[in-house]
């Protein structure tokens, strides 16, 4: 059997940087383009950084937890890494595509794995108009912000904003407000994964709003369009019994 070609990527955390040369000495090291699989060392940030670099080819990524938050990571063990990778279960993720137009008319494009969020930039609340598949669903939402979250991202910022947790295989997106003031009782909506969401900022010159695709931010926006990108799929590997759908299920029973 041909040895597994592994590329290693480590976050800047000391724990990850410390084990990086040891793993390269033990298993060899290839560039990400040459490798069969990429091993990300750190927390979820390291995993997201690695996945963003693989938007075009969807090369599988296996994460080992040496950071803070590790929802997308496996436990760290230096031994038996090729065997763990070969036995791993695969989760396929579909990223979101954001097109944000700022007040100057400049169009910014970015991709997100977890969520695309809009947030007020000042002490004044944001006022947002929500359009789904060309139909106005809400003329004005007064809030601190609004997000569109994927199933993989539903346990992150979306959950903190009291949004629903989505099973990883669900063909759904969560549309979740952040501190909605009016309508006060609105808690968001579930949308089909193929939905196109247009969000227009009401009075953007007086109530500025930023838009973020995961951690990539655009400020002073006038309009944002969010869609799932069907042409791109990302592959994340998990140890047996610890796959992403199981983690999401456990999260729903956590107190």
UniProtKB/Swiss-Prot annotation:
NAD(+) binds at residues 44-45, 114-115, 144, 152, 155-160. SUPFAM superfamilies: NAD kinase/diacylglycerol kinase-like. The keyword Cytoplasm applies. GO terms for cellular component: cytoplasm. It is found in: Cytoplasm. Transmembrane segments: none annotated. Keywords: ATP-binding, Cytoplasm, Kinase, NAD, NADP, Nucleotide-binding, Transferase. The keyword Kinase applies. InterPro entries: ATP-NAD_kinase_N, ATP-NAD_kinase_PpnK-typ_C, NAD/diacylglycerol_kinase_sf, NADK. Pfam families: NAD_kinase, NAD_kinase_C. One of its GO terms (biological process) is NAD metabolic process. Belongs to the NAD kinase family. Involved in the regulation of the intracellular balance of NAD and NADP, and is a key enzyme in the biosynthesis of NADP. Catalyzes specifically the phosphorylation on 2'-hydroxyl of the adenosine moiety of NAD to yield NADP. This is NAD kinase. It comes from Hyphomonas neptunium (strain ATCC 15444). The gene is nadK.
């Amino acid at each position: 059997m041909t040895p597994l070609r592994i590329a290693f990527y480590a976050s800047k955390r000391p724990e990850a940087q410390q084990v990086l040369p040891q793993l390269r000495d033990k298993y060899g090291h290839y560039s990400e383009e040459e490798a069969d699989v990429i091993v990300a060392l750190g927390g979820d940030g390291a995993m997201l950084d690695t996945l963003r670099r693989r938007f075009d080819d969807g090369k599988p990524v296996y994460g080992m937890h040496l950071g803070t938050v590790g929802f997308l990571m496996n436990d760290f063990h230096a031994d038996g890494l090729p065997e763990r990778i070969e036995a791993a279960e695969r989760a396929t993720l579909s990223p979101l595509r954001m097109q944000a137009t700022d007040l100057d008319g400049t169009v910014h494009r970015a991709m997100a794995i977890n969520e695309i969020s809009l947030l007020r930039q000042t002490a004044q609340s944001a006022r947002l108009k929500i359009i789904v598949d060309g139909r106005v669903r809400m003329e004005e939402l007064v809030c601190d912000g609004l997000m569109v979250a994927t199933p993989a991202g539903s346990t992150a910022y979306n959950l903190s904003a009291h949004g629903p947790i989505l099973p990883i295989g669900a063909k759904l997106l969560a549309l979740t407000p952040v501190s909605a003031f009016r309508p006060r009782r609105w808690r968001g909506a579930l949308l089909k994964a193929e939905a196109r969401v247009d969000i227009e900022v009401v009075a953007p010159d007086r109530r500025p709003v930023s838009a973020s695709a995961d951690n990539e931010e655009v400020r002073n926006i006038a309009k944002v369009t969010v869609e799932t990108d069907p042409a791109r799929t990302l592959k994340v590997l998990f140890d047996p019994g610890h796959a992403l759908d199981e983690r999401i299920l456990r999260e729903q029973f956590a107190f």
